[in-house]
Curated annotation (Swiss-Prot):
Transmembrane segments: none annotated. It comes from the Bacteria. It comes from Nitrobacter winogradskyi (strain ATCC 25391 / DSM 10237 / CIP 104748 / NCIMB 11846 / Nb-255). Keywords: Hydrolase. Its cofactor is a divalent metal cation. A motif (Nudix box) lies at residues 46-67. Coiled coil: none annotated. It is an enzyme of class 3 (hydrolase). InterPro entries: NUDIX_hydrolase-like_dom_sf (IPR015797), NUDIX_hydrolase_dom (IPR000086), RppH (IPR022927). Accelerates the degradation of transcripts by removing pyrophosphate from the 5'-end of triphosphorylated RNA, leading to a more labile monophosphorylated state that can stimulate subsequent ribonuclease cleavage. This is RNA pyrophosphohydrolase. Belongs to the Nudix hydrolase family. RppH subfamily.
Length: 170
């Protein structure tokens, strides 16, 4: 069996979806990932297919999780951000193949209407990733995420903080 420290990171993308009021989309995670039910909210994220461009992967994941296509790209964090999952769940998460994720993050402006968001029947017939959603002030995000992902969210919020108050078209 592969030692935890020798496992690779899963290559993924994350998307901060910001509405016209500067609020950020968060979804309540479905499934068993949660260690503590207090921290079940997160932004859309997901895996990058082999050979797939990260920006295209981010748009695909956003659509597959929310049905959203009405976006304008605002920013990208140039670095890959990583987190490790707790050892206690490493054998179950991703069938024990990864120790965590390395993520490329993007911020986008949502230019559609809220009724475009459909987490119950997301794009391309994918299984729902979220059971509920809401708009949150950016500064609240780190308190909503599961603790082992918090350092990534702290960096994402720091990098994209100037976008929180930016209005569409400015």
């Amino acid at each position: 069996m592969t030692r935890y420290d020798d496992l690779p990171y899963r290559t993924c993308v994350g998307m901060m979806l910001i509405n016209e009021r500067g609020l950020v989309f968060v979804g309540r995670r479905a499934g068993v990932e949660q260690v503590d039910d207090s921290y079940v909210w997160q932004m859309p994220q997901g895996g990058v297919d082999p050979g797939e461009d990260t920006w295209l992967a981010a748009k695909r994941e956003l659509y597959e999780e929310t049905s959203v296509r009405s976006i304008e790209k605002l920013a990208e964090i140039p670095d890959w951000l990583t987190y490790d999952i707790p050892r206690v769940v490493a054998g179950r998460a991703w069938k024990g193949r990864y120790r965590g994720q390395r993520q490329k993050w993007y911020a986008v402006r949502f230019i559609g209407e809220d009724n475009e968001i459909n987490i119950a029947n997301p794009g391309d017939g994918h299984k729902p990733e979220f059971t509920a959603w809401r708009w949150e002030p950016m500064q609240n995000l780190t308190g909503l995420i599961i603790p082992f992902k918090r350092p990534v969210y702290e960096r994402v919020v720091k990098e994209f903080a100037s976008l929180a108050g930016a209005q569409a078209g400015t």
